[in-house]
Design a protein with these regions (language model features):
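NAD(P)-dependent aldehyde/semialdehyde dehydrogenase
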Residues: 1-126
Length: 126
């Protein structure tokens, strides 16, 4: 709790030109209008909307976030939702996490959804 999103917004500012894509801005404008008409609190940096929401899938131009009170609560939530999570990118000590910068360059032993693909395919016939 109490995270200051200013650091996050500064880090992604280099992507601000995405708002010039007509399909993206249509999504941004639509989602912003729907949320504002519904009196939903948003964080807005003029090209990305941040909405506090525990759901996994956010609309285009929206990023969902969730607060947690302490690290053990976060770890419990991640464990409960592990079937719904494909990849956790973090510098924290979390089971089966991927380091920043490595999510698009997996090792041979890193399996999507933690399923050994070869083992899965070999056991299909059984």
């Amino acid at each position: 709790e109490g995270y200051n999103f200013e650091t996050f917004f500064k880090a992604i500012f280099c992507w601000k030109e995405i708002i010039n894509d007509h399909k993206y801005i249509n999504n941004y404008d639509y989602n912003k209008a729907v949320y504002l008409m519904s009196n939903i609190n948003l964080l807005d940096n003029e090209f990305l909307l941040l909405k506090e929401d525990i759901n996994f899938s956010s609309p285009i131009s929206v990023l969902f976030y969730e607060y947690y009170e302490n690290f053990s609560d976060l770890k419990k939530t991640l464990e409960l939702e592990k079937e719904n999570i494909q990849c956790i990118v973090s510098s924290m000590e979390i089971n089966q996490k991927v380091n920043f910068g490595d999510s698009q360059s997996p090792n041979l032993w890193d399996y999507a959804d933690d399923v050994d693909t070869l083992d899965f395919l070999l056991n299909l016939a059984n």
